[in-house]
């Protein structure tokens, strides 16, 4: 396994650990999710380029579309929560209430 793949897998792992450890603020969770999506995109693009598998060449673009939708939805949720509660603490949220 080359060093590039190991670095990308390490970036994904660090983002995952950051998501699991620093769950107190919504903004830090969103940044960790974006890091995970970026490392998945780079890994998919490099794998497709190295294997010359042309049928799957649309997969990284579809992953970017989902990442953009996730970022837009997360930022709109962050704005709504910060306007309602005045902070982005995740502990203050109760998702069972409307």
From Swiss-Prot:
E.C. number: 7.1.1.2
Residue ranges of the TM segments: 1-21, 29-49, 61-81
Result when mutating residue 65 to A = In strain: 66
Taxonomy, superkingdom:
Eukaryota
Localization per Swiss-Prot or TrEMBL: Mitochondrion inner membrane
Report the GO molecular function annotations: NADH dehydrogenase (ubiquinone) activity
Q: List the disulfide bonds.
A: none
GO terms, biological process:
ATP synthesis coupled electron transport
Gene3D superfamilies hit by this protein: 1.10.287.3510
Membrane topology label: Multi-pass membrane protein
**Keyword Membrane among record annotations:** yes
- Major subcellular location class: mitochondrion
Pfam family for this entry, one: Oxidored_q2
| InterPro entries from the UniProt entry | NADH_UbQ_OxRdtase_chain4L/K, NUOK/Mnh_C1-like
- Reaction equation(s) it catalyzes: a ubiquinone + NADH + 5 H(+)(in) = a ubiquinol + NAD(+) + 4 H(+)(out)
Keyword annotations from UniProtKB, A to Z:
Electron transport, Formylation, Membrane, Mitochondrion, Mitochondrion inner membrane, NAD, Respiratory chain, Translocase, Transmembrane, Transmembrane helix, Transport, Ubiquinone
Q: Where are the N-formylmethionine modifications? A: 1
Q: How does it assemble?
A: Core subunit of respiratory chain NADH dehydrogenase (Complex I) which is composed of 45 different subunits.
Family assignment from sequence similarity: Belongs to the complex I subunit 4L family.
What does this chain do?
Core subunit of the mitochondrial membrane respiratory chain NADH dehydrogenase (Complex I) which catalyzes electron transfer from NADH through the respiratory chain, using ubiquinone as an electron acceptor. Part of the enzyme membrane arm which is embedded in the lipid bilayer and involved in proton translocation.
Checking PANTHER family in the record gives: NADH-UBIQUINONE OXIDOREDUCTASE CHAIN 4L (PTHR11434:SF0), NADH-UBIQUINONE OXIDOREDUCTASE SUBUNIT ND4L (PTHR11434)
What name does this protein carry?
Answer: NADH-ubiquinone oxidoreductase chain 4L
Q: Please name the source species.
A: Bos taurus
């Amino acid at each position: 396994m080359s060093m590039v793949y190991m670095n990308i897998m390490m970036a994904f792992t660090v983002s995952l650990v950051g998501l699991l450890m620093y769950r107190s603020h919504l903004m830090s969770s969103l940044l960790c999710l974006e890091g995970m999506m970026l490392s998945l995109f780079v890994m998919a693009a490099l794998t497709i380029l190295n294997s010359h598998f042309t049928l799957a060449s649309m997969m990284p673009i579809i992953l970017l579309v989902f990442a953009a939708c996730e970022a837009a939805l997360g930022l709109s949720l962050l704005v709504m929560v910060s306007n309602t509660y005045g902070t982005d603490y995740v502990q203050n949220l109760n998702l069972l209430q409307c």
